Amino acid sequence: MVFGEFFHRPGQDEELVNLNVGGFKQSVDQSTLLRFPHTRLGKLLTCHSEEAILELCDDYSVADKEYYFDRNPSLFRYVLNFYYTGKLHVMEELCVFSFCQEIEYWGINELFIDSCCSSRYQERKEESHEKDWDQKSNDVSTDSSFEESSLFEKELEKFDELRFGQLRKKIWIRMENPAYCLSAKLIAISSLSVVLASIVAMCVHSMSEFQNEDGEVDDPVLEGVEIACIAWFTGELAIRLVAAPSQKKFWKNPLNIIDFVSIIPFYATLAVDTKEEESEDIENMGKVVQILRLMRIFRILKLARHSVGLRSLGATLRHSYHEVGLLLLFLSVGISIFSVLIYSVEKDELASSLTSIPICWWWATISMTTVGYGDTHPVTLAGKIIASTCIICGILVVALPITIIFNKFSKYYQKQKDMDVDQCSEDPPEKCHELPYFNIRDVYAQQVHAFITSLSSIGIVVSDPDSTDASSVEDNEDAYNTASLENCTAK
């Protein structure tokens, strides 16, 4: 019994309600239950038909006027104590989710939990949520790794049905898995070196030494490096495309799309430069080509094929859109508020550069993100106070979702490393064939039958099997061995 059950004892003249919860029987007066009419037991007293009663309880005895509930009797003692005292207490040894489901069944809100148990209950609930999230993340990571490994095996199986399947499989494994063998590592290192060389050449080409009044000056060395890099990128993409087991899945891979986009500007520029006629359309096309040349920076994304960290970052952002959206929302609200505040106190100052709300947007953005270029800044005391508040709020707002995103990044990074380790095997995974089933008695009978047949073939036949003793069997075996030896000698 719970202590609260002794506070109230129904009188003889009061109408009682008989409750049976998992074998625990208790008689409670109606006035006690009607104190909380929105709970399950409170609604039970307002039912006017047996059908309505059975919707709220598991069974009902008309003769005994007893309501039966197939629930945990030990938990119901705390529910019953709630009706007597108006306060809900939490068991020490109880699972938080089980208790939460139980009070939800009885229609009791968590707000009725007493202050002595509320903080402990919320702490346990948060801990359980964190453990549950970690477990789900691990399960998803494990399931995803298993699915990707299974997909890798299925891709290998497709090569058996393709033309030049074995050759294409060897090429595909070496192009997709740098840790497969020494040649695959050399290909990966070469590809990484070409990507870096292309980025360096693009950056060097933008220096003042390679510029004039008309624009960029074509340097033979840099142009040769650019052509060599594009030739490598084109050949690499073509080899991947030819060796891929499925052309459709090949173009669904974001890394392959990046490879394709990285070579488009070069060929688009080459196509425009071959046009000799001059027209307005060609001039406009030239401007487009200049923009496309800037797209060469996307080649740096090719490093994701060789970087576990970049792939993990992409997976983290893809699965953290809710947290990223929340971060952008917080920043947008803060920028809007502080830009208006700083504009209202700085607009009349001649020495201030914060003369419009769009300029204040820029100032609030670099302030909340704690960048602080210093190109625009407040000059009044009120403006400096607002700026200090803006910076502090920016630190707090940015720090809240970053922790969640960082935890997800750590999990995806570890998952990606585990997958790379699994794919480092020297040989591709093979099918696990089932073991053949056989009966040992059948095998023994077949061996004996073969032995008897061989005896018959050399003229040793047992006339009466029942009269055969151990010595005769030994004689037959000696004769069989002698005959076999003679046959081998003759051969």
Swiss-Prot record:
Residue ranges annotated as motif Selectivity filter: 370-375
Cited Pfam families: BTB_2 (PF02214), Ion_trans (PF00520)
Tissue and organ distribution: Expressed in myocytes. Detected in lung, spleen, brain and heart.
BP terms from Gene Ontology: action potential; potassium ion transmembrane transport; protein homooligomerization
Transmembrane segments: 183-204, 221-243, 255-275, 286-306, 322-343, 385-413
Membrane topology: Multi-pass membrane protein
Name of the protein: Delayed-rectifier potassium channel regulatory subunit KCNS3
UniProt source species: Rattus norvegicus (Rat)
Lineage of the organism: Eukaryota, Metazoa, Chordata, Craniata, Vertebrata
